[in-house]
Amino acid sequence: TYYDYQMVTNPAALFSENEVLQILEQMFPVKDAELRDTQTLNVAYGFYLNIITGELYKKNYAKAREYLALVSVTTIPAEIYYIHFNLRYLKNLTYYLYTGKMRYYKEVIAVIDMIESFGDVRLAEGMKKEMLQLTAGRTFNLEKGQFPLNIVTEK
């Protein structure tokens, strides 16, 4: 039920790796997903969001990438856009933190802008704040051709 998923999803980042794997095995695929409402599915799939986010805060980017790989083979209904947007945000944030490549940073910003344009300002603001916390003190790893140019001309 909704509350069963909530009891597991909310503290997800606190579980050990073994506990997470056991829970993933039991929770997914969601049984009778087509019979569940959007709220219940958001909470169920939110488990992935919480375990990935927890690893990012621990700076365990390799583990976050492992969890992203697991969720990539999980079928999440298309109408659960909240989860899809969050996973896209977390995937690009993880890869930015892992590689420092500017293209991932730009994609994070694009996802946040998209969410804001859909009217979910609260979620977008939360993502901006989280991104600033997680990227504080980081420098960009600019790829060839992606660095800013200053053209100096004489008058």
Regions found by a protein language model. Give the residues of each.
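"A position-specific structural signal for the A-helix of alpha-solenoid helical repeats
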Residues: 6-10, 46-54, 86-97, 127-130, ...
